[in-house]
Amino acid sequence: MGSMIPPLTIHVPEWMQGSIAWDQVYPTDEAKMRVAIDLAAQNVRQGTGGPFGAAIFDTATGRPVSAGVNSVIRLNNSVLHAEILAIMLGQQQIGAYTLHQPGRDHVLVSSCDPCAMCLGATLWSGVTRIVTGADRADASALSFDEGPVFPQSYSYLESRGIAITRGVLRGEAAAVLELYRRQGGVIYNA
């Protein structure tokens, strides 16, 4: 009997369906970051994944386009970080392989500085801006290995036209990481 390639199924946790007000305008970085932090916190409280949340917003309207939470352990897939899911779902939502559409810029808001993989995916995603909360040191304090991310990594993204704002509501975002640690969350890439 030969091997078969199994279908790839990716789904968000049930609780996410009602977790975002899709028609609401989130006018500030702080308002957008609260969405990402709330997703991360709920993911921890519900026991559905790691302490990371992300959302993509239409820059012109301030409305959310997509959202993702860390789903690595829940779906047995090492690439299912919050940012990756938000990017994939955002591209699916707008019906294009890139979020860079004429007249429609998008911002990726992540509860933590992206790891090396997510930073790379961001480059190709088409977002024109990244906003982050907790920083690499906060994630590393829990023993998460964020991979080879250097100051030059951010400089490169900026040279490619991606604006970066870091440390928005850092304390609130870092508190979700601490909640995950206190609850005995699995550090899957240590």
Residue ranges and their predicted role:
Residues 1-43, 104, 121-190:
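Zinc-dependent deaminase
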Residues 45-49:
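Short loop/turn motifs at secondary-structure junctions and domain boundaries
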Residues 52-58:
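Short beta-strand scaffold segments in enzyme catalytic cores
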Residues 65-66:
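A structural microfeature
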Residues 71-85:
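A short, polar/charged loop-to-alpha-helix boundary motif
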Residues 100-113:
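Immediate flanking context of iron-sulfur cluster ligation sites
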Residues 112, 116-119, 124:
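Conserved redox-active cysteine motifs that mediate thiol-disulfide chemistry
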